Amino acid sequence: MQIIHTIRELRAWRKNAGKVAFVPTMGNLHEGHLALVREAKKRADSVVVSIFVNRLQFGQGEDFDKYPRTLQQDADKLAAEGIAVVFAPDEKELYPNVEQRYNVEPPNLQNELCGKFRPGHFRGVATVVSKLFHIVSPDIACFGKKDYQQLAVIKGFVEDLNFDVEIVPVDTGRAEDGLALSSRNQYLSAAERDEAPRLYRELKAVAESLVQGSLDYAGLEKRAVQSLTEYGWVVDYVEIRRADTLEVARAGDKKLVVLAAACLGTTRLIDNLEIKLP
């Protein structure tokens, strides 16, 4: 396995790499990331995993400085998976100008759901992913469904800007108690970790009501927020949306997703659950 740090070297490798699948990450890899890697391996001759903590997608007061940088441990995990290349550029390599002068601006979705609470986050995501697509030139890119809004943003700009890459969504990896796997789970105290699976349980309760025929979307959202709040969560949102577009769900929609973001202590957790109605 190669660890490549420069764009020039990565592009030189790419010329003879055949069909390439790509998994972009910020490192600190866990089983959820490795599930993406394994899916990527099924679909291509070679897999590239990028490791880059992208400053542009962190807002003021967020955890950019304390986000774990664990390149050697990550490389060991990826070597064990048989990955061809780890692309680990530094900030100057990916952003040679002091300021990124041109950005990818996702319309609509940028200011909804998580975008309301993390201004500029999805601009940062879309910009860095588009840069990485230009550098790696993958045939396929795998993204986890845990970051459902991020996945929708990436699908949107790939379609609208004619990127020649197939986006492969991969189901959310979960711990045995249902908690979605996330690098930020390590910030949780022992007591918070015990409480954290409640977020997924509330999503399942909403989904069950929808499957049983409830059309009181606002009521279901409100009850989930109230339940989480009673147990000490600070809730950003619980919302039911159309799964394909993330537009507000309407009666008669068959493919839905319920999404949530909430803070437990100082740790912000997100999760979602897709629902197909009969």
Swiss-Prot record:
GO CC, sorted alphabetically, is: cytosol
Q: Which UniProt keywords apply?
A: ATP-binding, Cytoplasm, Ligase, Nucleotide-binding, Pantothenate biosynthesis
Keyword set includes Ligase: yes
InterPro entries noted in UniProt: Cyt_trans-like (IPR004821), Pantoate_ligase (IPR003721), Pantoate_ligase_C (IPR042176), Rossmann-like_a/b/a_fold (IPR014729)
Q: Where does ATP bind?
A: 26-33, 144-147, 173, 181-184
Q: Pathway of this protein? A: Cofactor biosynthesis; (R)-pantothenate biosynthesis; (R)-pantothenate from (R)-pantoate and beta-alanine: step 1/1
Give one Pfam family, short name only: Pantoate_ligase
Localization, UniProt: Cytoplasm
Output one GO MF annotation: pantoate-beta-alanine ligase activity
- Which residues are named in the active-site annotation? 33 (proton donor)
Catalytic activity reads:
(R)-pantoate + beta-alanine + ATP = (R)-pantothenate + AMP + diphosphate + H(+)
Identify the residues that bind (R)-pantoate.
57, 150
- As recorded in UniProt, its EC number(s) are 6.3.2.1
* Superkingdom field: Bacteria
Q: Which NCBIfam families match?
A: cyt_tran_rel, panC
Subunit details:
Homodimer.
**Other facts:** The reaction proceeds by a bi uni uni bi ping pong mechanism.
**Family label:** Belongs to the pantothenate synthetase family.
Q: What does this protein do?
A: Catalyzes the condensation of pantoate with beta-alanine in an ATP-dependent reaction via a pantoyl-adenylate intermediate.
Record-given protein name: Pantothenate synthetase
According to its UniProt entry, this protein's organism is Neisseria meningitidis serogroup B (strain ATCC BAA-335 / MC58)
**This protein's encoding gene:** panC
